[in-house]
Each structure stands twice: as structure tokens, then as C-alpha cells.
Amino acid sequence: DKVFSLLKKIIKDEKIENLNIPISIVTTDIDNNKEVVIKEGSMYDAIRASCSIPGLVKPYNLNGINYVDGGVLNPLPINKLCYKEKIITVNLNGHPTTSLFGKKTKRRSYLNYFNSLKSYFSNNQNTKHLGIYDITYRSVHMIQNQLSMMQIEKHNTFKNINIPCDVCHPLEFYKAKQILEEGAKFYK
């Protein structure tokens, strides 16, 4: 709630339909299992509804409906864009820079991932114990990255920026400046 109180101070709560640039904010209606695109109404409500990460941030109730992060159903909503001239995608679920076991890695492949799992389960005492959070977090990012890659392949994009999912973790809002700097590196 502290972060969202700060968000209210930073973002002027304008009506989306009155903005100079047309935008669509994607969220997920968790009550009715459907994707919702918000194109009008309160900017704050739309942003708040779209960033409720399941298990970490409670759903946002708006007009009696509970909303969670739009990425649950559509992590890279290219298909919902208002303006489709030159599409620059920013995929926040890119391949991690480290393996689940802390080793630096280049672009991850499923073969590398399964080899890591094989190594882990082969009684190697040097590997760290994977907790349920680690496994769940990485699994969700793998799913979202695959869905994002499918969207990129399907649409004509101008530039694709793939940010490794381990640049930051959910709720590391205090790292905003560092995260923006990291993102700028991937844009070049």
C-alpha cells in the first residue's frame, strides 16, 4: 500500500481518454477469467489494477470486480496496441542471466535448463536447495517469456528489447533507478 500511495503522488490521476497519446492498459479480471483492456477512466485505477501480481500484491477491486496483473493472460499485449506504426516491445520476462543454481549463463535454452535440473537431482552437494518460491518464480517467467515470444513472432515489430527476468524481482521498487539504467542498456 505504501508503493501505491507514492504512485498516487507521482502520477497525476488523469482520465485515460484525455491523454495526448492513446494508451491501453491491460489487466486480468480474476473473477471471470478474462483479459480486460482499459482505454478510459482513471489512470491510477487502471495502473493499480494492472500491476497486482498474484501472490505478492492483493487484487485491486474496481466496481466490484477483482483485477490482477494483465501479464497473467497476456504478458506482452502487442495485439491490444492503439497505435501500430512502429512497435517497440519491452519483454520483462526475458531469459535470466543466472541459472536457478546461481551460475552465470548466456541465453537460456530448455536443454540447458533440463541439464541444470539433472545436475541438481544427481546428489551433487554443491548445488543450492531450490525453494518453492524459486521454482514457481522461474516457471512463471518461462511461461510468460514463451507467450511473449509468440506475440513477437506473430506481429510485425520494429524493435524488441528483452530484459532478463532476474534484473530485479517483484516488489523491488526501491531499485527503480538501477532498473531503468539496466533497461537502457538493453535498448542499445
What does each of the following model-derived ranges do?
Residues S50:
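Short helix- or helix-capping micro-motifs
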Residues D1-I10, T28-S42, I65, G71-K188:
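Non-catalytic peripheral regions of patatin-like phospholipases
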Residues E17, P59, I78-C82:
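Short, conserved, surface-exposed binding loops centered on an aromatic residue
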